[in-house]
């Protein structure tokens, strides 16, 4: 698959100067030097996968890719509420929460659903229960992977969450409860200009790749004419 990716990029007339492991790029953007040195687990919850990377003594010591991510959350919502996928994604982003216990049962949402009725009222708490179930599964897989790696108990800096799913309300608290580690949301650091636009955990990898290129003084490349 890497060969296919390289061919694709070269086919667009772009010279590839280096390949960078995704957790290394994300870590470049969101981790502090102290976290890397002390011991931290970086969790990047993407659309279809979740990348887990353990940093100790300033270096990456263990990586793992889990075959689940934010799209599974959206799919669970679509199935549970019998609503189209795009509606489920919108509900997740606008009203989603990973801690249903913090939401009142009377908080209702009007949802487009399949069938003759077209719409129905759904409690936001029920939406959160659907999200919590899948989020717990992802976090428990991460905990299992940390224990399997042998670095359990060696991560005093805790966990840093990034990726679009990290922006989900309650995700940090749920992660802290399940893993028993300090947790924070990783936002890209050392930015100038359009900070409000890029300072989101969803842009961790993109910003990190740019910072990696600057740090390692990679040559600039531009599209080549056909």
Where are these regions (language model features)?
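Acidic-glycine-rich active-site phosphate/pyrophosphate-binding loop
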Residues: 45-49, 53, 176-188
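Feature representing long, continuous alpha-helical segments
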Residues: 75, 125, 129, 133-140, ...
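Nucleotide/phosphate-binding catalytic cleft detector across ATP-hydrolyzing
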Residues: 1-42, 59, 70, 81-128, ...
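Phosphate/pyrophosphate-binding loops at sites that engage ATP/ADP/AMP, CoA/4′-phosphopantetheine
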Residues: 139, 143-158
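Residue-level signature of catalytic and energy-coupling elements of molecular machines
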Residues: 9, 44, 77, 142, ...
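Glycine-rich phosphate-binding loop of actin/hexokinase-like ATP-binding domains
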Residues: 38-80
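Glycine-rich phosphate-binding loops at beta-strand->alpha-helix junctions
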Residues: 97-99, 154-178
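Extended, low-charge hydrophobic alpha-helical regions
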Residues: 155, 188-189
């Amino acid at each position: 698959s890497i060969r296919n990716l390289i061919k694709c990029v070269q086919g667009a007339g772009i010279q590839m100067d280096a390949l960078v492991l995704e957790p290394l790029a994300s870590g470049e953007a969101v981790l502090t030097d102290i976290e890397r040195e002390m011991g931290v687990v970086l969790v990047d919850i993407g659309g279809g996968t979740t990348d887990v990377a353990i940093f100790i003594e300033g270096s990456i010591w263990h990586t793992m890719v889990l075959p689940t991510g934010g799209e599974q959350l959206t799919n669970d919502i679509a199935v549970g509420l019998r609503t189209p996928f795009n509606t489920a994604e919108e509900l997740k982003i606008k009203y989603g929460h990973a801690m249903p216990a913090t939401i009142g049962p009377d908080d209702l949402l009007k949802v487009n659903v399949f069938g003759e009725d077209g719409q129905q009222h759904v409690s936001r708490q029920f939406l959160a229960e659907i999200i919590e179930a899948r989020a717990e599964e992802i976090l428990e897989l991460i905990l299992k992977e940390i224990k399997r790696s042998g670095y359990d108990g060696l991560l005093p800096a805790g966990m840093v969450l990034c990726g679009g799913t990290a922006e989900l309300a309650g995700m940090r608290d749920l992660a802290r409860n399940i893993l028993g580690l300090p947790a924070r949301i990783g936002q890209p650091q050392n930015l100038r200009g359009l900070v409000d636009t890029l300072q989101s955990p969803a842009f961790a990898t993109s910003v990190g790749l740019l910072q990696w290129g600057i740090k390692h003084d990679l040559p600039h490349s531009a599209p080549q004419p056909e």
